[in-house]
Amino acid sequence: GRITILLREFGINSYGVDISQTAIDEAVEFGKHFGFDIKDGVKIYDGNKIPYNDNFFDFTISESVMDSMPFELAKKLIKEIDRVTKKYFFLSLISSESNKIFNQLENNKIFIDEIEVEDEHEKGTIQSFFNLEKIEELIKSTNFKIKWCEKHTLENVLNKTHHGRYYLVLEKE
């Protein structure tokens, strides 16, 4: 909901989907706080089909979403995003270097698989870690190609942990 609200602040017609009715209800309430009624603009995604027509969106955004699910589900979701998107797709994905911030993983290994988070933040959710090869695997069965890609890595200098995210713009050919 936060991106839907942000885009509306800029005067852009925006819509959102989520798998959780609770998240949608919270987004609607959050929107009211900023003076926006987004109730008609947010819908449930049933895990199979995004409830919008083909090429409905000029562009789509997925901020910190596709890495918070099993990789196989992300591959299914990106095909649906491909279906409803006319041209561009912006997404961010957690990088493999970020595994050191999760207590249950060994601190000296690069990890590109997925885990169930045990730490307080997002406890019980799936976290899937990415490198460029895994990103290419994610998009290979879509019409998207990487137009722009950056990886931002931050270091906590006190405990020497790193957190990184890929930021990508995908373009339909």
Describe the residue ranges of each PLM region.
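Class I (Rossmann-like) S-adenosyl-L-methionine-dependent methyltransferase catalytic domain
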Residues: G1-K49, L73-K76, F89-E173
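Carboxylate-rich, divalent-cation-coordinating active-site regions
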Residues: Y52
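Class I S-adenosylmethionine-dependent transferase superfamily signal
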Residues: E80-I81
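Helix-to-beta-strand junctions that scaffold the AdoMet/dcAdoMet cofactor pocket
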Residues: M69-E72, T85-K86
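A conserved beta-strand element that flanks and buttresses the S-adenosyl-L-methionine
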Residues: I61
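Short catalytic micro-motifs in class I SAM-dependent methyltransferases
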Residues: S64-S68
